[in-house]
Amino acid sequence: FVRILDREPCDFSRGRFRSERIHHQVNIKTKRKMSFWKKLLLMILVLASLSYFVWQNEDFQRKYLYPYDYQDTINFYADRYEVDRNLVASVILAESKFRQDATSVHGARGLMQIMPETGNWIATQIEDDSFSVDKLYNVNMNIKYGTWYLSELQTEFEGNEVLALAAYNAGRGNVYEWMEKYHWDINFKDYTKIPFPETREYVKRVLENKKHYNKLYK
């Protein structure tokens, strides 16, 4: 019994030492984890700050977000058909992201995504005997036809960009149907009420693009 009592303090001390050592190791691991998360958070904040300043940089935006390829051609036909230059660029960005060879699943072609039947109709209206469907991939012809069509729609809808853009995307027939069904007049501006989700998003995107183009290309 005495031997057992003599041994107890020693066992207790060893147990206490072991407990303290484990506690110390846990503290070290906890501190390491905290240090790791602090470093990670700092890195995220630094990257977020850099990203913000890069994305706000106008040169970066012009080059990567809101380019103005074919600017001379856009300006020429926009002036010729009395359409806002930046509106034409905004439509091209939304339609094809300035890819000359873009083709939609529905068959729309080129920079301004003109359907073959629409292209043929435009050719008749402007008396262009040189039209062929393959030429819709030609930069000059595509921008010429698309800009003329925008001008035609803006005239038809009395300068209302929302209705003209909705017609460019969904067809003028649908727009007239919506105007009658929902009692829209020629002053309609609330694109959020457009019933087709694709057209609603399209009009929103083009108008947002135009705001950026107006800011970047004054």
Give the label of every model feature segment.
Residues F1-S35:
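N-terminal Lys/Arg-rich, disordered targeting/topogenic segments
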Residues V2-L5, R14, V46, L50, ...:
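Generic secretory/membrane-interface signal
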Residues L5-R7, R18, K39, N57, ...:
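Intrinsic disorder/low-complexity segments enriched in polar/charged and small flexible residues
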Residues K38-Q56:
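Hydrophobic membrane-insertion alpha-helices, especially the h-region
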Residues F53-K218:
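Catalytic glycan-binding domains that act on GlcNAc-containing polysaccharides
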